[in-house]
Regions:
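Histidine-dependent nucleotide/RNA phosphoesterase domain, centered on the 2H-phosphoesterase fold
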Residues: 1-182
């Protein structure tokens, strides 16, 4: 099963992101845009895991949740990771020491359970589209699409599975851990 650990987003946040995504689509020729129901913030991509690994992941996530308390993030920008004339469109967040601490704790807990660290480190973003090709250029899109700042409540982390349902990719939560730290 193909998995990742993520922060799930509330419907209100997903609606807000979908509005920014729709504005961006008007300025683009084409792209593979993320369905609203799949918006999330990835903390650690695991890839293919065995069913037996779930118990170890639960232990790592429990330890992480025990050491971190709920916090708030702020969504505040739209950006691109360009790859030639196409790129990945994302929504970005203000820097957060709480998010960095959550990520660091998760990485240590996963490593103690025998999993590899995230090779790219933490680059907090919510993917809005892949293979996005703007009519003009990425800078033009960024100038013309405003993402009004919005607060995101982070109360839990979830182990998600990527499941193919026909032509669609669906992210299914396998379990969640509420943040309980002090």
């Amino acid at each position: 099963m193909r998995t990742f650990i993520a922060i799930e987003l509330e419907e209100e946040v997903k609606d807000h992101l979908a509005e920014a995504q729709a504005e961006t689509q008007k300025l683009c020729r084409r792209g593979n845009f993320t369905p609203k129901e799949n918006f999330h913030l990835t903390l650690h991509f695991l890839g293919e895991i065995a069913e037996d690994d779930i118990e170890y992941l639960q232990d790592a996530m429990y330890e992480t949740a025990r050491r971190n308390r709920p916090f708030t993030l702020t969504l505040d920008k739209v950006g691109f990771f360009p790859r030639g004339n196409k790129g990945i469109m994302w929504a970005g967040l203000e820097r957060s020491t709480h998010l960095q601490r959550l990520f660091s704790t998760l990485e240590k807990s996963l490593e103690q359970q025998g999993f590899s660290r995230e090779r790219k480190g933490l680059s907090p973003h919510i993917t809005l589209g892949r293979e996005v090709e703007p009519h003009r250029n990425f800078i033009d899109v960024q100038k013309n699409v405003r993402l009004e700042p919005m607060k995101i409540s982070v109360r839990s982390i979830a182990l998600m599975e990527s499941v193919r349902k026909g032509p669609k990719l669906v992210y299914v939560p396998l379990f969640r851990m509420d943040l309980k730290g002090r």
